[in-house]
């Protein structure tokens, strides 16, 4: 037997239960990982609330973690018992002591990166990789807008953009978060609690606006984001922290300057083991060179997952949060 977090109904943090369960034996192409650290991500709240339906109830939760290979299936070729591994695209169930995944979902973890760092960086770091390097390939000298710059993905984006020679304007909700974003490489910050974001972007870009805007907030920032994109520029919508964007009239894109909009997801970019490992290797390289540092500002025991979700929803967290089995 092992312990895991599960939910039998959709709802708030109170639906999360810390339960005993029987881990499955790995199938022929599967690996069982003993988690040493587990990542907490906003997407976890979408599954818990039912915004993203789980495959069935009761369900496990979480998709990111790091640990050691405990058992392998008969046809596994890339991993052996004892290997240090990390993952971010597996099935729901990472909030557990033991997790079974297809071997294609795992990456090898370098010795220079510990389990907590890996669990804190995998999903957010790989998300940052595809956003800045693939969805739109940033070039040095460009000025971009990134919402929620002091959040988990935001702090990685600040650092990665700086390493690329890109000027990142980050939106934040407080002076403390503004300082945090700047400490991580943001060129400028806009405090949306008392500043007009679109007006400040016009000022900071000499009226040119931004070739790309990254928005994980959703409903509350949709109109503002469109107003910050330069003509024929791209709005990258990659989250729904304030709720999903609905009722969109596509004509607004022509009115705002023939804009493009995309709604990417990690799975579409890391769709082969080779691509996933290559993306992870680029991320790990930046960490080992010191271009990206990992801020783990909150740690919770696995049994405290409900409290961790409460803190995340209230936006009382900064940087990354990990759960410890």
Curated annotation (Swiss-Prot):
What SUPFAM superfamilies does the annotation carry? Answer: GroES-like (SSF50129), NAD(P)-binding Rossmann-fold domains (SSF51735)
Put simply, this protein is called Quinone oxidoreductase
What Pfam families does this protein map onto? ADH_N, ADH_zinc_N
Assigned protein family: Belongs to the zinc-containing alcohol dehydrogenase family. Quinone oxidoreductase subfamily.
The gene coding this protein: qor
Q: Which GO terms describe its cellular component?
A: cytosol
The protein's organism comes out as Pseudomonas aeruginosa (strain ATCC 15692 / DSM 22644 / CIP 104116 / JCM 14847 / LMG 12228 / 1C / PRS 101 / PAO1)
Could you list this entry's UniProt keywords, alphabetically sorted.
NADP, Oxidoreductase
Reaction equations catalysed: 2 a quinone + NADPH + H(+) = 2 a 1,4-benzosemiquinone + NADP(+)
Q: Gene3D superfamilies from the entry?
A: Medium-chain alcohol dehydrogenases, catalytic domain, NAD(P)-binding Rossmann-like Domain
């Amino acid at each position: 037997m092992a312990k895991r977090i599960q939910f039998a109904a959709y709802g708030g943090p109170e639906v999360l239960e810390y339960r005993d369960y029987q881990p499955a034996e790995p199938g022929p192409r599967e690996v069982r990982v003993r988690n040493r650290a587990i990542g907490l991500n906003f997407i976890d709240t979408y599954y818990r609330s039912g915004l993203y339906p789980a495959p069935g109830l009761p369900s496990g939760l979480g998709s990111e973690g790091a640990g050691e290979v405990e058992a392998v299936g008969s046809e596994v070729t890339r991993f052996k018992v004892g290997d240090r591994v990390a993952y971010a695209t597996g099935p729901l169930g990472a909030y557990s002591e033991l997790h079974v995944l297809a071997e294609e979902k795992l990456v090898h973890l370098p010795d220079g990166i510990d389990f907590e760092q890996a669990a804190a960086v995998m999903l957010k770091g790989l998300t940052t990789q595809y956003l800045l390097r693939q969805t739109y390939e940033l070039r040095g000298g460009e000025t971009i807008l990134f919402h929620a710059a002091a959040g988990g993905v935001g702090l990685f984006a600040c650092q990665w953009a700086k390493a690329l020679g890109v000027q990142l304007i980050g939106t934040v909700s407080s002076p403390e978060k503004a300082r945090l974003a700047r400490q991580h490489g943001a060129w400028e910050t806009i405090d949306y609690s008392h500043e007009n974001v679109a007006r400040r972007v016009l000022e900071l870009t000499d009226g040119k606006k931004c070739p790309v805007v990254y928005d994980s907030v959703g409903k509350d920032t949709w109109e503002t984001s469109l107003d910050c994109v330069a003509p024929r520029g791209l709005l990258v919508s990659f989250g729904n922290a304030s709720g999903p964007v609905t009722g969109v009239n596509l004509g607004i894109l022509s009115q705002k300057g023939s804009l493009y909009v995309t709604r990417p997801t990690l799975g579409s970019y890391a769709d082969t083991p080779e691509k996933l490992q290559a993306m992870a290797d680029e991320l790990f390289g930046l960490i080992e060179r010191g271009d990206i540092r990992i801020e783990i500002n909150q740690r919770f025991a696995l049994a405290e997952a409900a409290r961790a979700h409460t803190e995340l929803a209230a936006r009382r967290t900064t940087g990354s949060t990990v759960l410890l089995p």
